[in-house]
Design a protein with these regions (language model features):
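Acidic helix/loop microenvironments that form the catalytic cleft of cell-wall polysaccharide enzymes
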Residues: 87-90, 185-204
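Peptidoglycan-targeting cell-wall enzymes and recognition modules
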Residues: 26-60, 64, 83-174
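N-terminal secretory targeting signals
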Residues: 1-32
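Low-complexity, Gly/Ser/Thr/Pro-rich intrinsically disordered linker/tail segments
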Residues: 12, 21, 196-221
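Non-transmembrane alpha-helical segments in soluble domains
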Residues: 66, 84-87, 172-173, 194, ...
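Proteins synthesized as precursors that undergo proteolytic processing into mature forms
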Residues: 167-169, 178-185
């Protein structure tokens, strides 16, 4: 009898979790504005070019954020806060959608440990497939799989992931969903979110501060 009771309780618990999951997936999306992004970002004094880039970028990506947030169920304030905080740091406060790696991307080249993990197999793959988009899609494998998901070619011209704001956001949302980052965001686990997005903990303290700013903008704190 106890075993049956435990099984029934476990079944009920699973049904409740499924119902809660459906409830989260079907929630009205969080509305993102350019002002929110501007306030989440830090700004550069006496660097007009970067300020202009920030201003252009935050306005360019807002409609696409709201579109893809709906598709990929970033529809709670907490999920949105984590996504925006990570995007803010990855893009140097929304100033650039292209990574500036320490060695120009050669550290990702075929034959290196990182390069092998990223699926870089040809000479020049490291610089060619540096991080681009809001969450810095990196490596031949990721560009290939992203293109396959949407029946597009991002291998011939990978710079499209950074040059086109729509694609920059779409790539980030694709990677967020691929890595199941919503689960860590729901737990408010900044360490796990950072690991899933970054592959390490680069800029962790900066990401924590960006998360605080994002939570304030979204009314969480």
């Amino acid at each position: 009898m106890k075993t049956k009771a435990k099984m029934a309780a476990k079944c009920l618990s699973s049904l409740v979790k499924m119902a809660m999951g459906d409830k989260i997936r079907n929630r009205q999306m969080v509305d993102i504005t350019a002002d929110m992004l501007w306030n989440i970002a830090r700004h550069y004094r006496h660097k007009e070019t970067l300020l202009n880039s920030q201003y252009y970028n935050v306005h360019a990506i807002v409609p696409h954020l709201n579109q893809w947030f709906t598709v990929y169920a970033i529809n709670t304030e907490l999920r949105a806060a984590h996504f925006l905080a990570q995007a803010c740091v990855e893009t140097a406060n929304f100033s650039s959608f292209t990574e500036v790696p320490r060695d120009g991307g050669r550290e990702y080249d075929a034959g290196t440990r990182i390069g092998r993990n990223l699926g870089n197999t040809e000479v020049g793959d490291g610089p060619k497939f540096i991080g681009r988009g809001l969450l810095h899609l990196t490596g031949r494998d990721n560009y290939t799989n992203f293109g396959s998901e949407f029946d597009k070619d991002y291998i011939t011209d990978p710079t499209m992931v950074a040059r086109n704001p729509y694609v920059a956001v779409k790539a980030a949302r694709y990677y967020w969903d691929l890595r199941h980052v919503n689960t860590a965001a729901d737990r408010d686990d900044i360490n796990k979110v950072t690991l899933l997005v970054n592959g390490g903990y680069n800029g962790l303290e900066e990401r924590k501060m960006a998360l605080i700013r994002a939570k304030r903008e979204l009314g969480i704190i």
